């Protein structure tokens, strides 16, 4: 007996790990948030630039996040001309290529902002995605620390434009040269120690995640993720001695951080005080340069009302020696924006968001293409992370914007209904014709309109058509009727308001009145 042919298996619909779909509500919230960021960046004189998602892999270079070799940490493929191309892992490396390629045509300093998706070929985990959004601003061709100070001020202004009050965020600033100077003092200067220096930087960069004793393991022989030997993955450390590790931990100590002033301005230390404390951690030219640059930044911040002083206890930007940033290409001042808000997620669990943006000076990135010094500094906001925070604190809505006005259909002749839709659209009203099964009942079409979050629906049966009128059903008010069932008089009154008729030539005006009454506006 012949075997029965097997049914072909259905393809399983599934999303790759570390990626996420987004719906209308989230997209609308992103759009609102991005517009506010854009307004601040443009107020500072930055202009938009777009670069492709793909770059030649060698243009991205060795500056890959948490990796020491090209092609690791990025998604790459070989083109038909046998050249390797990769999805961008941030928006800074592509900008460096863009500026280098168009160097003679661009004004210097070149000031631009960019917004888009970036991609990381890393192990995904909770809150760690392989694709996420960033919004960057960069100044290329400005050699002084004034450009870095401006980035910090702009970061503070952006947080406040997004509805985060002073005291609920802080912009933290440091200088890579300060830590480099400390590393030189313990014998880790020179190119031959570049790998160990980077391991130290990445260990200190995890200070917000791990306790000091865990950081010390990363500075020493290494750390097991499981908490004890043999458990979990092993991260090799920088192999520093205990004395060397102690000096590094002391130089990046939170006790140096400016601020902690009383309401009357007493107590606390200023940013300038912090710089002077840092000068005492080592005695070499590298550390001196770093502290001199931080002093310039501190003076500018104080002059503009952003710094930590006794006259300005409401601190917006502080010098914090624990900030190092994990990317290798930073060469000078580095900065980070941290949210100080404690909130709860949808399940009532406490959430502390921490860093939502950062950046720094990268004087060597454009220079790779030019063979000459090209100073640059930039700031990047993690849009996805910041959006999650703003949604939880109520500064961004998590509801979709109103859907279109739905024109329902009766019978096979749809030309008249399509004309209604066209009339509404010409008046600037979002509208659509119900294009589902033409045999669907009015009730089924209303269910569709509800799912579309429509503010109202247009109904015209054969009787209304003969009279030249339409019925307008207020779906927002209709949804509220259930809460009025105990108050019969009010219920009947609102029920009458929830559906009314008008002449066809009055339809647009009546819909506009309803939308205004319900506060419906499409962004």
Swiss-Prot record:
Pfam family, one: tRNA-synt_His
The protein's Enzyme Commission number: 6.1.1.21
Molecular functions per Gene Ontology: ATP binding; histidine-tRNA ligase activity
Top-level taxon in the UniProt lineage: Bacteria
Disulfide bonds: none
SUPFAM superfamilies with a match to the protein in the record: Class II aaRS ABD-related, Class II aaRS and biotin synthetases
Localisation per UniProt entry: Cytoplasm
InterPro entries, per the entry: aa-tRNA-synth_II, aa-tRNA-synth_II/BPL/LPL, Anticodon-bd, Anticodon-bd_dom_sf, His-tRNA-ligase, HisRS-like_core, HisRS/HisZ
Protein name per its UniProtKB record: Histidine--tRNA ligase
């Amino acid at each position: 007996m012949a075997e029965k042919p097997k049914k072909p298996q259905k393809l399983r619909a599934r999303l790759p790990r570390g990626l996420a779909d987004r719906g209308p509500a989230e997209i609308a919230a992103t759009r609102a948030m991005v517009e506010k960021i854009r307004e601040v960046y443009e107020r500072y004189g930055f202009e938009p630039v777009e670069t492709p998602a793909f770059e030649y892999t060698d243009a991205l270079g060795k500056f890959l996040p948490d990796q020491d070799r090209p092609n690791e940490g990025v998604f790459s493929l070989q083109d038909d001309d046998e050249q390797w191309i990769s999805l961008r892992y941030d928006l800074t490396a592509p900008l460096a290529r863009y500026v280098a390629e168009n160097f003679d045509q661009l004004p210097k300093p070149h000031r631009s902002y960019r917004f888009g998706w970036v991609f990381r070929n890393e192990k995904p985990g909770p809150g760690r995605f392989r694709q996420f959004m960033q919004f960057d601003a960069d100044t290329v061709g400005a050699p002084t620390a004034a450009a870095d100070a401006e980035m910090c001020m702009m970061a503070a202004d952006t947080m406040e434009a997004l509805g985060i009050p002073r005291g609920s965020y802080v912009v933290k600033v440091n200088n890579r040269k300060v830590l480099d100077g400390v590393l030189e003092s313990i014998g880790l200067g020179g190119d031959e120690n570049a790998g160990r220096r980077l391991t130290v930087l990445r260990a200190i960069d995890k200070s917000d995640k791990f306790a000091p004793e865990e950081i010390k393991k990363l500075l020493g022989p290494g750390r097991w993720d499981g908490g004890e030997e043999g458990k979990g993955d092993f991260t090799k450390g920088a192999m520093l001695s205990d004395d060397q590790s102690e000096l590094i931990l002391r130089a990046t100590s939170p006790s140096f951080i400016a601020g902690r002033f009383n309401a009357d301005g007493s107590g606390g230390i200023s940013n300038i005080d912090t710089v002077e404390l840092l000068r005492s951690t080592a005695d070499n030219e590298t550390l001196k340069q770093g502290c001199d640059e931080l002093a310039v930044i501190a003076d500018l911040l104080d002059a503009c009302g952003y710094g930590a002083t006794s006259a300005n206890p409401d601190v917006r930007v502080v010098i914090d020696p624990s900030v190092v940033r994990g990317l290798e290409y930073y060469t000078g001042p580095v900065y980070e924006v941290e949210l100080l808000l404690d909130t709860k997620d949808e399940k009532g669990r406490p959430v502390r968001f921490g860093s939502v943006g950062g950046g720094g000076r990268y004087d060597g990135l454009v220079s790779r293409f030019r063979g000459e010094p090209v100073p640059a500094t930039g700031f990047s906001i993690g849009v996805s992370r910041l959006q999650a925070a703003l949604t939880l604190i109520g500064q961004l809505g998590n509801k979709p914007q109103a859907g279109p006005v739905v024109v329902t259909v009766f019978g096979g002749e749809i030309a008249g209904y399509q004309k209604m839709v066209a009339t509404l659209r010409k008046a600037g009203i979002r509208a659509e014709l119900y294009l589902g099964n033409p045999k669907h009942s009015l009730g089924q079409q209303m269910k569709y309109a509800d799912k579309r979050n429509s503010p109202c629906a247009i109904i015209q049966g054969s009787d209304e058509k003969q009279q030249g009128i339409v019925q307008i059903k207020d779906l927002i008010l209709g949804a509220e009727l259930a809460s009025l069932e105990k108050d019969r008089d009010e219920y009947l009154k609102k029920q009458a308001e929830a559906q009314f008729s008008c002449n066809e030539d009055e339809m647009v005006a009546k819909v506009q009145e309803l939308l205004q009454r319900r506060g419906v506006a499409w962004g």
